Curated annotation (Swiss-Prot):
Keywords: Isopeptide bond, Phosphoprotein, Ubl conjugation. There is a cross-link at residue 525 (Glycyl lysine isopeptide (Lys-Gly) (interchain with G-Cter in ubiquitin)). This is Fanconi anemia group I protein. It comes from Gallus gallus (Chicken). Monoubiquitinated by FANCL during S phase and upon genotoxic stress. Deubiquitinated by USP1 as cells enter G2/M, or once DNA repair is completed. Monoubiquitination requires the FANCA-FANCB-FANCC-FANCE-FANCF-FANCG-FANCM complex. Ubiquitination is required for binding to chromatin, DNA repair, and normal cell cycle progression. Monoubiquitination is stimulated by DNA-binding. Phosphorylated in response to DNA damage by ATM and/or ATR. Phosphorylation of FANCI promotes ubiquitination of FANCD2, which prevents DNA release from the FANCI-FANCD2 complex. Changing residue 567 to D: Phosphomimetic mutation that promotes ubiquitination on FANCD2.
Length: 1338
């Protein structure tokens, strides 16, 4: 039969063809098409023949065509045909479809919908035909039956799409359907249906099928709905990531059916999807714009949804497109800073923590992106690198005193900018570790910034470089040429940068001979440079090389393991590859350094400070270094035993014209000798063993040094100040050459005395004679110190009370203090009595300890041996703290003999030292605070590290200082020590930071602090301020301080009286600390300051309320509950704050800072009330919410308890200023011209103090304006509680007004409203602050 149809079709006889086809039943027709298709012969020709004999003009023809279409769809989807045959059949059917009438198209389209609903599609090939059918249907103008009514083609198509998107889809056909919809013209609404349906299908598909589906969706988004597509994709992968994380946290998942896919598979799929989206953005820039716009909007509502690891990765991949890079980085940096600020605000307030417990941390998300990028996400890495550097450059470390960047050592500050910088460094370091291809680029950029930003501190970049080198020292061999290029610029860099850079790349020097040789060449050239900085850089470099290239046989004991920062990497394989070469190399460097001993003092100083470390790390150089030092000191040592003084001081200075300079830092030289000799004797000499051949030579210089130091000690004790030409009559003026010379001499002599004190104490072995020598040396030191202080005092120098930087080492200071105050050994008693007999010496010892701790706190390191070794510094701090703590608690200040009241008492110095130590510990050793507190508790020395309860240990220390403070507060007025009380309060504040705010100890401490403030009528302003600041800092971590503020405000009101003198105030007192002396300005300003902080918290909450109010997501119930909780919290806070201000505005505050601060705080309060009212206006617009009763009460409270009182307070302020002006005028009349300046000053002060008044009135009126708006929206009359006042920021003087009007008849009446602002509430531009009034001249 098929052959006959083909033949008839070829003959071109339509009648016969139609007749033949009419004779076939539906089944026969189908079988014929199937047989022909399976044989693969002339299928298209057969179909064409059938269509030719089935004209659309005849009903039978249309019916037959439909039968063929239905059968072909089934045939194609059966999977029995070859792909080529399928394409041929579908192509022909698509061509013929446009000829079908509307009702046939409708029937065919309905068939497809049913097929899809049944899930009968196997390969989706027939869907190409479906798209053509729907397109043709949409163009049909024919009325089509649908249900009981009729629709046109377009409407019918819309109903079909709606039905299709509402029905169940077979997951296997989703991609085909998404592809099909691209070819159909869709309205915006239809497209939204389709996109939402496809997105809902994501969760039902196998993960591997997601990328091609995303690709189809992105192509489909060319029609529109870009935001929906992007939002759906991001949300899907965000949920997958969360589920994956949850499963990692709880690996034994009970619900095995919903176990997520393997991590690596998920990451690879995410990476592919990101690439698809980036490719789409490259083709259509609007998708990128829509992505940024969507994430910005979402970030305002829910940062956790907007900035998840997937979306951040997508943004960073997109940022490679330069047009969007700036927008993306600005958005990410803003988000990071905002996240840091929000966390900072939350951590400071228990009230906020309770209301908003879960807070999003964007930094953790970005670091997770770095971790995820390890799964082959090369497209993300460049964005990560750019973001990392952008964050680091947005912040520069501050320079501390002396120009050295302090951030390296001082730990991370809480500032958001610094946290952002730290995040940038973490991003770069982790990216460096994960992605090998980009390592050279990161290294290149870091080195470039170290060089080009040398004028500003680059410590954060050097720290990053250090960490990079530590993570992969061998990797740098590939970049050695770049490092070598950097060395060429060493001469032009500041010395701090040079030292940091060399320490950072030091591991590379051990594994790369070429880099080491390049550095040596650069350093040898620099050592002869004209520039002082270049020579210092050379010395720093050579010392580093000497420390790190050990000669075989050098000691490797623990005492030689001084850290030089985190960059220390031991490459032992290379360290001793050629010990002979190392020795020659080191001796050559020493030869170069010897030449530096004839250069400026700064260069010599670096050498003297560096030799000790070299000696400890490279002990085989001991002989060479000791010989060098011996020959150097001999130039200044006078061997004749009867000559005084024993050293040639004149050789230490150099004159250039009228200027005098220090040429040889003799005290530093002697200090270096003392430390090197002590180390040599205690270490090398004891380890010599069988090496007798060198022993004689070594004993020679050792004996020389000992004899020399012994002689210098003896003669220094004998020497009088006149021997140094430094008696009291000497000139110490810094403006004259003689004065400068004498100052240099004095500092050198004092330094030499200190060096000898340390030397003799160490070798004395508790000998009475030696300790007498120590005291003799101190006497010499002290005389000079007193003279310098006296001279500095006469010159009104700020350095008058500061001792010169001490030459004692930190280790020795801890030993000396322990001996003076804690050594109870009977054998030491007689010798120590010598030192203990001198109160001045003991005070000096504590003063030096204080100075050392201060230096450590400010610079992160101290002078002298081990000054840069964090471990040794920590141990020394623990020892010093134990001694100072014992000394302070054992001997109260009141019973201490303060030595003719000269200088601070030892107890007070101990207290200052303890405060600095506690601060330093929290800054530099935060991670080691448990060990520190354990070291102070001698009763629990053996506790395991894991068992240390920081809160308990800190509470124990706090109790000691509480007792001392109570003793101070209960002492007689004459015995009260204000300075000591302030220090105790500050120490308690510092230690309180170690308490867990949720602990019982914290609550006990807070209760105690409240009690102290309530029961002690303290009149010392500084102590009062300290106690209240402590109280507030504790209270905010326990609960909101508003009720506390109210009680304090009531006390201030009671103390200062009412603005209405006829009003009697109930004499009740909550806090005795609030009294006539402290109430204003001290307590008042503290209360206002704390109220401002509460207002800032409320403002932050209102912003979150606004964000929650604009969230229209499905999870509206949770948002609604959160909104109600926030609204309740805000209204309660504001309600109590209104009662605080209600008290203060009725208080007769003195003119000045209190009035000014109160007026400004009131303006803020009304501005925040206005923000709250705006929030409710917005809520009324978006929902049918009514005004809650709480808000109504708040408005009523503001209308009854605040606004009227504000106007009364304004009148009061104007009255007190009028009185002060009148008083000044009277004085002017009496003394005429002499007092003109006084009047001008008073007038300026009045103008300054009354400046906030117009702003306050404007804020009140803005509040009332928006209350009117809310009343209209909510149908609740809120204005019934507000009494409009005619009192504004002026008072009309009728007589003056008349005279002015007579004088200025010609003046336009428009100026009059400027003088009468009673109608300000109806200004044309409501958001503009009122203009300043013009002052008329009389």
């Amino acid at each position: 039969m098929a052959q006959r149809i083909l033949q008839l079709a070829a003959e071109g006889s339509p009648e016969r063809l139609q007749e033949a086809l009419q004779g076939l039943t539906e089944g026969e027709l189908g079988d014929m098409v199937t047989r022909q298709a399976l044989r693969g012969r002339e299928t298209a020709a057969l179909l064409k023949g059938i269509f030719k004999g089935s004209p659309c003009s005849q009903q039978s023809g249309v019916l037959r065509r439909l039968q063929v279409y239905k059968h072909c769809v089934s045939l194609v989807e059966s999977g029995d045909l070859h792909v080529g045959k399928v394409s041929e059949i579908i192509g022909l059917l698509m061509l013929e479809a446009r000829q079908l009438p509307g009702h046939a198209l409708a029937e065919l389209a309905t068939l497809f919908v049913e097929v899809i609903k049944r899930g009968s599609l196997s390969n989706g090939k027939s869907l190409e035909l479906f798209s053509t059918v729907l397109t043709a249907l949409s163009n049909s103008k024919e009325s089509l039956a649908y249900g009981k009514g009729e629709l046109n083609g377009e409407e019918f198509k819309k109903q079909l799409i709606n039905t299709l998107c509402s029905s169940k889809w077979d997951p296997q056909c989703v991609i085909h359907l998404a592809n099909m919809f691209r070819d159909i013209p869709l309205s915006g609404e239809e497209l939204q249906f389709v996109v939402e349906k496809v997105l809902r299908m994501f969760s039902k598909l196998d993960l591997q099928e997601i990328p091609p589906l995303v690709y189809q969706l992105l192509l489909l988004s060319a029609k529109g709905s870009k935001k929906t597509v992007l939002e759906g994709i991001i949300s899907f992968f965000n949920q997958l990531d969360k589920r994956q994380k949850e499963e990692q946290r709880v690996p034994q998942s009970a619900d095995l059916e919903v176990a997520t896919v393997p991590l690596d598979q998920l990451r690879h799929v995410e990476g592919t999807v990101i690439l698809h989206i980036v490719s789409a953005i490259n083709l259509d820039q609007d998708i990128g714009e829509e992505l940024i716009k969507h994430l910005k909007t979402e970030q305002q509502k829910d940062p956790g949804k907007a900035l998840c690891p997937f979306s951040v990765s997508l943004l960073l991949s997109t940022a490679v497109k330069h047009r969007l890079q700036e927008q993306i980085f600005d958005f990410l940096k803003t988000s990071i800073t905002r996240s840091c600020k929000d966390l900072q605000i939350l951590q400071a307030s228990k009230f906020l923590q309770d209301l908003c417990p879960q807070q999003y941390d964007v930094t953790a998300v970005i670091l997770e992106v770095v971790k995820n990028s390890a799964f082959g996400w090369d497209h993300v890495t460049q964005g990560l690198v750019d973001l990392g550097f952008s964050l680091m450059e947005s912040y520069e470390p501050k320079k501390s005193f002396g120009g050295k960047a302090a951030e390296t050592n001082l730990g991370l500050s809480k500032m958001p900018a610094q946290q952002a910088c730290k995040l940038g460094a973490s991003i770069l370091l982790e990216t460096f570790k994960v992605h090998e291809p980009i390592r050279s680029d990161i290294l290149e950029q870091v080195l470039n910034r170290v060089l080009t930003k040398a004028a500003s501190p680059v410590s954060h970049f050097i720290d990053l470089l250090s960490n990079i080198v530590v993570s992969a020292p061998l990797v740098l061999q590939n970049s050695s040429s770049r490092v070598t290029e950097t060395f060429d610029n060493l001469s032009f860099l500041p010395i701090d940068t040079v030292q940091g850079l060399l320490r950072a790349v030091q591991p590379l020097l051990k594994v790369s001979m070429s880099v080491r040789d390049s550095l040596i060449l650069v350093l040898q050239k620099a050592i002869f440079s004209r520039q002082l900085d270049a020579r210092k850089a050379a010395v720093a470099g050579f010392l580093l090389l000497l420390r790190n290239f050990k000669i075989l046989g050098s000691l490797t004991s623990s005492q030689c393991s001084q850290a030089i920062g985190a960059t220390q990497v031991q490459a032992d394989v290379h360290a001793c590859y050629n010990s002979a070469a190392n020795e020659a190399f080191c001796l050559e460097i020493l030869g170069s350094l010897r030449r530096c001993l004839s250069q400026q003092a700064d260069v010599r100083l670096m050498l003297y400070e560096g030799f000790y470390d070299v000696l400890r790390r490279n002990s085989q150089l001991a002989s060479s270094i000791m010989e060098t030092l011996l020959s150097q000191i001999k130039q200044y040592y006078l061997p004749q035993q009867d000559l005084l003084p024993p050293l040639k001081l004149e050789g230490c200075i150099m004159a250039q014209g009228d200027q005098i300079f220090l040429q040889e830092p003799l005290a530093h030289l002697l200090c270096c000798i003392q430390h090197c000799l002590a180390w040599y004797k205690s270490t090398v000499h004891l380890c010599k063993g069988a090496e007798d051949e060198e022993e004689e030579e070594d004993v020679g210089f050792e004996q020389n040094f000992e004899e020399m130091l012994e002689s210098v000690t003896r003669r220094m004790i004998k020497s009088e100040l006149e021997d140094f030409e430094l008696d009291k009559s000497a000139d110490f003026s810094p403006s004259s050459g003689v004065g400068v010379k004498n100052n240099i001499y004095a500092i050198q002599v004092m330094g030499i005395c200190e060096v000898l004190i340390e030397y003799n104490f160490k070798i004395g072995n508790f000998s009475k004679n030696k300790f007498e020598d120590v005291l003799g040396l101190f006497t010499c030191y002290n005389k000079l110190s007193e003279i310098l202080k006296e001279k500095a005092g006469k010159n009104k120098s700020t350095l008058g009370n500061r001792i010169a930087r001490s030459f004692l080492s930190m280790g020795f200071v801890s030993t000396l203090l322990t001996a003076l105050f804690r050594d109870n050994a009977q054998s030491h008693e007689e010798s120590l009595a010598v030192l203990r007999s001198s109160t001045e010496f003991m005070r000096y010892a504590v003063s030096v300890a204080l100075q050392k701790v201060q230096q450590l706190e400010e610079m992160g390191q101290t002078d002298g041996p081990d000054g840069q070794n964090p471990e040794k510094m920590f141990q020394n701090l623990c020892k010093i703290t134990r001694v100072l703590l014992w000394r302070y608690t054992s001997i109260p200040t009141a019973v201490e003999e303060s030595g003719k009241k000269k200088g601070k008492s030892i107890s007070l110095l101990c207290l200052e030292g303890l405060l600095r130590i506690f601060n330093t510990m929290q800054q530099l050793y935060a991670a080691r605070i448990p060990q520190f507190l354990q070291a102070l508790d001698i009763t629990d020395g053996d506790a395991e590290e894991a068992d240390i309860n920081v809160t308990e240990k800190a509470a124990f220390q706090i109790r000691q200082f509480q007792r001392s403070l109570v003793n101070q507060l209960s002492s007689a007025e004459d015995d009260f020590n204000s300075k000591e009380t302030q220090l105790l309060i500050t120490i308690l504040s510092t230690l309180s930071k170690l308490l867990d705010p949720g602990s019982q100890q914290f609550l006990q401490f807070l209760t105690w602090t409240v009690k102290i403030c309530k029961e002690n009528a303290l009149e010392d302003l500084s102590c009062c301020k300290g106690l209240l600041t402590l109280l507030f800092s504790l209270h905010v971590l326990y609960k909101s301080p508003v009720s506390l503020l109210r009680e304090l405000a009531q006390d201030i009101h009671a103390c200062l009286g009412d603005i209405d003198q006829d009003v009697e105030i109930e004499s009740r007192s909550h806090f005795a600390i609030v009294n006539v002396k402290t109430a204003a300005p001290t307590v008042c300003l503290l209360v206002l300051g704390q109220a401002d902080k509460v207002l800032e918290e409320v403002d932050w909450l209102i912003k979150r309320l606004t964000i929650l109010g604009s969230d229209t997501s499905e999870d509206s119930t949770q948002a609604s509950n959160q909104t109600q909780a926030l609204e309740k919290g805000v209204i309660l806070q504001l309600g109590t704050l209104l009662t605080v201000f209600h008290e203060l505005v009725q208080t007769a505050l003195p003119a000045g800072s209190c009035v000014d601060s109160l007026l400004r705080s009131l303006s803020k309060t009304y501005a925040i009330l206005t923000s709250l009212i705006k929030h409710y206006i917005q809520a009324c617009r978006s929902t049918s919410n009514t005004v809650p009763g709480r808000l109504e009460k708040l408005v009523k409270l503001s209308g009854s308890h605040l606004t009227p009182q504000c106007y009364s307070f304004i009148t009061y302020v104007q009255n007190i200023h009028s009185e002060s002006l009148s008083f000044a005028e009277e004085k002017k009349k009496k003394k005429k011209e002499d007092e003109t300046a006084v009047v001008s000053t008073v007038m300026a002060k009045v103008l300054r103090d009354t400046k906030p008044i117009p702003n306050l009135i404007f804020a009140i009126e803005q509040y009332e304006k928006f209350l009117i708006h809310l009343s209209k929206k909510s149908k609740v009359n809120l204005m019934q509680y507000m009494k409009l006042s005619t009192s504004r920021d002026f008072r009309i003087n009728a007589s003056m007004l008349d005279s002015v009007l007579q004088e200025q008849n010609t003046e336009d009446a428009e100026n009059e409203p400027d003088n009468n602002q009673s109608g300000t509430a109806e200004q044309p531009d409501e958001n503009q602050e009122p203009q300043k009034k013009r002052r008329r001249k009389k």
